[in-house]
Amino acid sequence: MDIKKVTGVYFSPAGSTKTVVETTVDELARLFKAECRYISLNTPSDRAQEYQFAPDELVVFGCPVYAGRLPNKISPDFARCLHGEGTPAVALVTYGGRAYDNALAEMCELLTKNNFKPAAGGAFLCRHVFSDKLAAGRPDAADLSELRMLAQDAALKLRNGGEI
């Protein structure tokens, strides 16, 4: 698969999910020798826009988990504003130490319904948004290294034409 652009799309009210997405996008862009860009969905005005993604673009979508789910008040906005064209995707969820339950599967389902083709996914521990003590310092250097390895595995899979 010939990837021309890698786009990071994130909802990251506390900043950790943005770090996870940026690390992954930067590695994928390096591996594919592709340009990269970032789209924040943090504000209602960000989510009011419609975003269309081409088949030769790779989208890395990241979102935090709340009570084991994608944010229920904002997920409908994601479903409305993100549109693929058979676009490959990497699904990333972040959580603060309790559990991510079915959030990763939920994200893959959302992406698939919007004409994306999930090729890889992962759940990553980040500092809990309500406490500096839960998962303090996460994502750390080891987490960022794991993200780069995930990106390398995803790139290899995409080059070989695979999806989840």
Language model features: what each stretch is:
Residues M1-V20, V25-P44, Q49-I164:
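FMN-binding flavodoxin-like domain, especially the glycine-rich phosphate-binding loop
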